[in-house]
Every structure is written in C-alpha cells, then in structure tokens.
Amino acid sequence: MEDVRETLYQDADVHFLCDYLSGINIVALHLNITPGAWSVGKFKKYHSIFVDKIVPFLKARNYNEVYATPFENDIKAQKLIKMFGLHQYGQNMGLVLMKKEI
C-alpha cells in the first residue's frame, strides 16, 4: 500500500488533510489555514468539525491516534495543534512530534 493523502474537509479558509502512512498504519493530520482568516469563531467552527466529523471518520477506519509534525520554530502552529488536543511527545529533525489518542 502506498501513502495516501486525502482531503477530509475544505472551505475558503481551511483545508484539513490526512496522510495515511503505509507500513505503519498511522494518520498524520495537516491543517492549512488561509493567512489572515483565523479568529476565535473560526477556531470553534473547525474544532467542532474535527471533533464531530473527522475523529469519527478516522475511528470508523480503526485509527486510534492522530499525529501532527509542526516545525520546531513555528510556535503558532504548535499552539494551534495543541488547541485541537494534540500533545508533544518528542522532536526529530527540526519537527515537533505531536499526537492525540482518539
């Protein structure tokens, strides 16, 4: 099986992507946000989409963890990922390794 990238949700301001990594059976979440499009209201909207749609979608496919790897020097990205419930568990090659059990 090859690595597969799938769009889980997309609108004008945000793009939730998911990588299914072959050989290790894990999911890596990517969150791309249009610059200047972020607000507390949008966070609440996207957090709800993550909790109510994306997590159940992944659970239904027998995944029990979600991973993210923001750059070490991107503190904003790390804070944002923490807001979605992921926590840091290590660092490697300039990346912060984060995960959430679902």
Go through the PLM ranges and name each one:
Residues H15, K76-Y89:
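Low-complexity, intrinsically disordered Gly/Pro/Thr-rich segments
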Residues D3-L17:
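Conserved beta-hairpin
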Residues I24-V40, V96:
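Conserved acetyl-CoA binding element of GNAT-fold acetyltransferases
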Residues H87-K99:
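Conserved catalytic-core motifs of GNAT/GCN5-like acyltransferases
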Residues V14-I26:
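A conserved beta-strand-loop-helix scaffold within acyl/acetyltransferase catalytic domains
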Residues V40-F57, K79, M83:
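Conserved acetyl-CoA-binding loop-helix of GNAT-fold acetyltransferases
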Residues V66-Q78:
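Conserved beta-strand-loop-alpha-helix junction that forms the acyl-donor binding cleft
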